[in-house]
């Protein structure tokens, strides 16, 4: 068990679609509440799958959150009473790749615990640059796995489907959706975008 320090830190929860990233984020935030620490959570405006203004896991767990367009919007919502800052679906924010690293490092340097969740790879199995940069400087990185819908192995890839077939390589990188558009797949069952 990792003992949390009293100083600032960055924690990253990553993985493919349906790996339980938001559920794990909500679990950690519930522990923060039990410790009577004040928190603020953020969710991207682009994430329209569930309730705007809430972090919502695929199994229905939820936490109230502020809606933002950019990671740079987070400091404006903070006050001196906040101990923990949480950001869900980081890869959906409209920012240059280094913005998340800069903002999260600044918050951690100010003594805050920063917990970020998001996809580590896009549907092409390429790293999301913002997540990759943040993972490099985080004190803790937890990669979660889903179950491959094809063979039952641990899944590490998000297969985007269009009419039941893998999306082409030139499809937009960001398309918000759930089981109607994506499947969790292992390396062997993943079909590269062409």
Curated annotation (Swiss-Prot):
<feature type="binding site">
    <location>
        <position position="186"/>
    </location>
    <ligand>
        <name>Zn(2+)</name>
    </ligand>
</feature>
<protein>
    <recommendedName>
        <fullName>Thymidine kinase</fullName>
        <ecNumber>2.7.1.21</ecNumber>
    </recommendedName>
</protein>
<dbReference type="InterPro" id="IPR001267">
    <property type="entry name" value="Thymidine_kinase"/>
</dbReference>
<comment type="similarity">
    <text>Belongs to the thymidine kinase family.</text>
</comment>
<comment type="subunit">
    <text>Homotetramer.</text>
</comment>
<feature type="binding site">
    <location>
        <position position="151"/>
    </location>
    <ligand>
        <name>Zn(2+)</name>
    </ligand>
</feature>
<keyword id="KW-0237">DNA synthesis</keyword>
<dbReference type="GO" id="GO:0005524">
    <property type="term" value="F:ATP binding"/>
</dbReference>
<dbReference type="GO" id="GO:0046104">
    <property type="term" value="P:thymidine metabolic process"/>
</dbReference>
<feature type="active site" description="Proton acceptor">
    <location>
        <position position="89"/>
    </location>
</feature>
<dbReference type="InterPro" id="IPR027417">
    <property type="entry name" value="P-loop_NTPase"/>
</dbReference>
<dbReference type="GO" id="GO:0008270">
    <property type="term" value="F:zinc ion binding"/>
</dbReference>
<dbReference type="Pfam" id="PF00265">
    <property type="entry name" value="TK"/>
</dbReference>
<dbReference type="GO" id="GO:0005829">
    <property type="term" value="C:cytosol"/>
</dbReference>
<feature type="binding site">
    <location>
        <position position="148"/>
    </location>
    <ligand>
        <name>Zn(2+)</name>
    </ligand>
</feature>
<dbReference type="InterPro" id="IPR020633">
    <property type="entry name" value="Thymidine_kinase_CS"/>
</dbReference>
<keyword id="KW-0479">Metal-binding</keyword>
<dbReference type="GO" id="GO:0004797">
    <property type="term" value="F:thymidine kinase activity"/>
</dbReference>
<keyword id="KW-0808">Transferase</keyword>
<keyword id="KW-0547">Nucleotide-binding</keyword>
<dbReference type="GO" id="GO:0071897">
    <property type="term" value="P:DNA biosynthetic process"/>
</dbReference>
<keyword id="KW-0862">Zinc</keyword>
<feature type="binding site">
    <location>
        <begin position="88"/>
        <end position="91"/>
    </location>
    <ligand>
        <name>ATP</name>
    </ligand>
</feature>
<feature type="binding site">
    <location>
        <position position="189"/>
    </location>
    <ligand>
        <name>Zn(2+)</name>
    </ligand>
</feature>
<keyword id="KW-0418">Kinase</keyword>
<keyword id="KW-0067">ATP-binding</keyword>
<feature type="binding site">
    <location>
        <begin position="15"/>
        <end position="22"/>
    </location>
    <ligand>
        <name>ATP</name>
    </ligand>
</feature>
<keyword id="KW-0963">Cytoplasm</keyword>
């Amino acid at each position: 068990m990792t003992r949390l320090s009293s100083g600032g830190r960055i924690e990253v929860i990553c993985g493919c679609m349906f790996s339980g990233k938001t559920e794990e984020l909500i679990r950690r935030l519930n522990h923060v509440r039990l410790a009577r620490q004040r928190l603020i959570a953020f969710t991207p405006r682009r994430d329209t799958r569930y309730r705007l203004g809430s972090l919502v896991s695929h199994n229905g767990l939820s936490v109230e959150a502020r809606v933002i367009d950019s990671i740079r919007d987070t400091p404006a919502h903070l006050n001196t009473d906040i101990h923990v800052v949480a950001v869900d679906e980081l890869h959906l924010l409209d920012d240059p790749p280094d913005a998340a690293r800069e903002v999260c490092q600044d918050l951690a340097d100010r003594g805050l615990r920063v917990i970020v969740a998001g996809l580590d790879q896009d549907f092409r199995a390429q790293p999301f640059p913002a997540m990759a940069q943040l993972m490099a400087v985080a004190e803790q990185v937890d990669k979660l796995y889903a179950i491959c819908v094809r063979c039952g192995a641990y899944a590490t890839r998000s297969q985007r489907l269009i009419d039941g077939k893998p999306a082409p390589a030139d499809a937009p990188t960001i398309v918000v959706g759930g089981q109607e558009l994506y499947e969790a797949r292992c390396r062997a069952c993943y079909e590269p975008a062409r």
